[in-house]
């Protein structure tokens, strides 16, 4: 069964469409109008082994907040649809990813009990024109809508770009592990409850 989903979101602030294939080859076509976010989402596709298409436009004459958050929301909704009832998946995943002097760790549980633990500090308020406080907004929106328990931690780092990119790459690798099908489960949900869809 193909694990592919398309979701869209239209509000007075943004218009977004996301297509996500969990079993892709790492291809990305992303145009959010926010250059650094595009760069980070390309990392999700490339290192997560997913195919990702995103078209977004938002009220960036105000700032990038609505676009960043709503892309996270819509991508999370697409992830939830693509992963389906979560039967037979590995469920848990973690990754440590370095980028030069920075090292980050991400741990995920595809539990359908969304939450975000965020322990990331940036030494600067911006990466280029991108507000670093918006990284947490994207991760929170994606985790909430995707039904993911997520722990994101920057263990150390000095460069804000490197810290952010190592977090996104670590998320990609953690999701890749958690989404993998575990043949030993025989299609059963990896939970003593017998389900992860409720």
Swiss-Prot record:
EC id: 4.2.1.19
Pfam families per record: IGPD
Entry keyword Ligase: no
Keyword Cytoplasm set for record: yes
InterPro entries: IGPD_sf, ImidazoleglycerolP_deHydtase, ImidazoleglycerP_deHydtase_CS, Ribosomal_Su5_D2-typ_SF
EC class name: lyase
CDD domains tied to this protein: IGPD
Chief place of localization: cytoplasm
A single GO cellular-component term on record: cytoplasm
Alphabetized GO MF terms: imidazoleglycerol-phosphate dehydratase activity
Keywords, in A-Z order: Amino-acid biosynthesis, Cytoplasm, Histidine biosynthesis, Lyase
Entry's localization field: Cytoplasm
Catalytic activity field: D-erythro-1-(imidazol-4-yl)glycerol 3-phosphate = 3-(imidazol-4-yl)-2-oxopropyl phosphate + H2O
Annotated GO biological process: L-histidine biosynthetic process
Domain of life, source organism: Bacteria
UniProt pathway annotation: Amino-acid biosynthesis; L-histidine biosynthesis; L-histidine from 5-phospho-alpha-D-ribose 1-diphosphate: step 6/9
SUPFAM superfamilies xrefs: Ribosomal protein S5 domain 2-like (SSF54211)
Listed NCBIfam families: PRK00951.1-1 (NF002106), PRK00951.1-5 (NF002109), PRK00951.2-1 (NF002111), PRK00951.2-4 (NF002114)
Similarity comment: family membership: Belongs to the imidazoleglycerol-phosphate dehydratase family.
Name of the featured protein: Imidazoleglycerol-phosphate dehydratase
Species annotation: Magnetococcus marinus (strain ATCC BAA-1437 / JCM 17883 / MC-1)
């Amino acid at each position: 069964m193909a694990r592919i989903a398309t979701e869209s979101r239209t509000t007075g602030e943004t218009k977004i469409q996301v297509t996500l294939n969990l079993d892709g080859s790492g291809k990305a076509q992303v145009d959010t109008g926010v250059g650094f976010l595009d760069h980070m989402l390309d990392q999700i596709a490339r290192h997560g082994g997913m195919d990702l298409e995103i078209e977004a436009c938002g009220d960036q004459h105000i700032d990038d907040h609505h676009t960043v958050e709503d892309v996270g929301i819509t991508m999370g909704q697409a992830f939830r649809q693509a992963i389906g009832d979560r039967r037979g998946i590995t469920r848990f995943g973690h990754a440590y990813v370095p980028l030069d002097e920075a090292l980050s760790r991400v741990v995920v549980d595809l539990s359908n009990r969304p939450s975000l633990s965020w322990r990331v500090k940036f030494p600067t308020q911006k990466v280029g024109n991108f507000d670093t406080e918006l990284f947490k907004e994207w991760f929170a929106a994606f985790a909430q809508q995707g039904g993911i328990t997520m722990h994101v931690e920057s263990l150390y780092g000095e460069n804000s770009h490197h810290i952010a990119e190592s977090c996104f790459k670590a998320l990609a690798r953690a999701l890749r592990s958690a989404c993998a099908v575990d043949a030993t489960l025989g299609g059963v949900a990896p939970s003593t409850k017998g389900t992860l869809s409720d």
